[in-house]
Amino acid sequence: MIRRATLDDLGQVISLVREFCTADRHPFDPIRVENALRPLLLDDAFGQVWVIEQLGRLSGYAVVTWGYSLESGGRECILDEIFVLEKESGEGSRLLEFTIDEARSCGARSMFLETEAHNQRVRGFYARHGFEIENSVWLSRSLD
């Protein structure tokens, strides 16, 4: 079942984030992750965390965060992370479509995401769900 994550899920979600970071070779800082997750688990002000629960265990998660843009015509969102333990099971597709529907019901007009340019498999997955490569280039700067 897919449901909203709660503070009671924090430990299991952090474990899933660790697995995601390990699989994708991203740095993992459990304190930073916990500090970022807590506000999302408390209310909808910054976004939502969705989890797949099977027999009392979490087997996947998705994080959607809110933004606002003139170009989008109002509220937009970023699919910040999505991860499922069982690849090729259909769970990733189910979770992605669920988050799209939920974001739409919360008034989001666009959903954005980013993935590594070389990851053709994942890019194909997102393309099958209607995501398109844009001509724009995102730049970032740490404000820490």
What do these predicted regions represent?
Residues 126-136:
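Conserved acetyl-CoA-binding loop of GNAT-fold acetyltransferases
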Residues 113-128:
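Low-complexity, intrinsically disordered Gly/Pro/Thr-rich segments
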Residues 5, 82-84, 115:
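Hydrophobic adenine-recognition pocket in adenosine-nucleotide-binding enzymes
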